[in-house]
Amino acid sequence: EKMGWLGIDPSSIRHILITHQDTDHVGAVEADSLGLFRKAKLYVGETENRYLTGEVRRKVIYHLYKLPQVTIRNEKVLLHDGEAFEIDGIRIECFLVPGHTWGHMVYLIDGKYLFTGDTIWLGADGGYSFISALAEDNRLAVRSLAELEAKLEARKLHPMFLTGHTGWTDNFTFAFAHKDKLCSPFKKRVHDPSAPYDAYDESDDTEERSKSGYLKGVGR
């Protein structure tokens, strides 16, 4: 529906970057989906691909539950940490940021736009390591986020951060404000003012706004 707002035909999409294999991120390319993107080539981290081959099972809720294996039949290109390549003149750099999943990949586009998937949760007071109950390894997630910040700082890169669930920000300091803290699903804001909560107001995500090319950021 939302691609239709922009006049984009899903069947015309030829390349899709996969941050990680959770169904809420890859459902539209799963074998039992409607097949909207059946012609697209998928780019996924080599480590993350082990979930897709069945070598590793995805565990959530502090490893209490195993999720069903995700099946994808599209052509895949396996990527590695630090790899850079181009698609139709667009430069893409890969950053391995494990923790939420073992092979979670973050993509920097033309040095300006960082697609962070489920590595950062933008709370109203800044970014946190993503929801603790859904991580394979929370300590690794926190450490990986700090390493990502250091890599970007070392290259003086301050991109726009586009998250998988909590909107976007172009405020570097805000994005990493609480990188050493987990977004806990057990902290309730009504009882705990320090509990992180989603700062992204989805009421802003309308057809009119999308066509104007602007959705409000957070931390600005």
Language-model region placement:
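Active-site HxH/HxHxD metal-binding segment of metal-dependent hydrolases
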Residues: 1-80, 185-189, 196
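Catalytic core of the metallo-beta-lactamase
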Residues: 1-11, 27-28, 70-127
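Metallo-beta-lactamase
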Residues: 91-98, 102-174
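Short secondary-structure transition/capping segments
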Residues: 59-70, 94-96, 128, 201-220
